[in-house]
């Protein structure tokens, strides 16, 4: 008999109060895949929407349209 409850067979899982742990983990992973695996089209749309919202918020906060990063070269020009 295997002591790890995840690797127990169905016969050995009958005496466990929580049931078959491996089947429950498989169901959970399938549910997460369904939630996270919405498809590449939705991912692209979400990325574009988030970028657009980020640009609008940045413009609303006073960014004059310059794209600045945290690099050393750009930090000097952004502080002007």
Swiss-Prot record:
The compartments listed are: Secreted
Q: Does the keyword Secreted apply?
A: yes
Cross-link Lanthionine (Ser-Cys) position reads 58-68
Keyword terms of this UniProt record: Antibiotic, Antimicrobial, Bacteriocin, Lantibiotic, Lipid-binding, Secreted, Thioether bond
Q: A biological process (GO) annotation for this entry? A: killing of cells of another organism
Q: What is its main location?
A: secreted
Positions of post-translational 2,3-didehydrobutyrine modification: 43, 47
Q: How is it modified after translation?
A: The lanthionine formed by Ser-58 and Cys-68 forms a putative lipid II binding motif. Maturation of FlvA1 peptides involves the enzymatic conversion of Thr, and Ser into dehydrated AA and the formation of thioether bonds with cysteines. Modifications are processed by the flavecin synthetase FlvM1. This is followed by membrane translocation and cleavage of the modified precursor.
Q: Which residues form the propeptide?
A: 1-38
**Is Secreted one of the keywords UniProt gives this record?**
yes
GO molecular-function annotation terms?
lipid binding; signaling receptor binding
Spell out the GO cellular component terms annotated for this protein, sorted alphabetically and separated by semicolons.
Answer: extracellular region
Where is the Beta-methyllanthionine (Thr-Cys) crosslink found in the sequence?
Answer: 52-55, 69-74, 71-78
Q: What does this protein do?
A: Lanthionine-containing peptide antibiotic (lantibiotic) only active on Gram-positive bacteria in synergy with Flvbeta peptides, which are encoded by the same operon than Flvalpha.a. Shows antibacterial activity in synergy with Flvbeta.b, Flvbeta.c, Flvbeta.e and Flvbeta.g. Does not show antibacterial activity when tested with Flvbeta.a, Flvbeta.d, Flvbeta.f and Flvbeta.h. The bactericidal activity of lantibiotics is based on depolarization of energized bacterial cytoplasmic membranes, initiated by the formation of aqueous transmembrane pores.
Q: Any idea what this protein is called?
A: Lantibiotic Flvalpha.a
What organism does the record attribute this protein to?
Ruminococcus flavefaciens
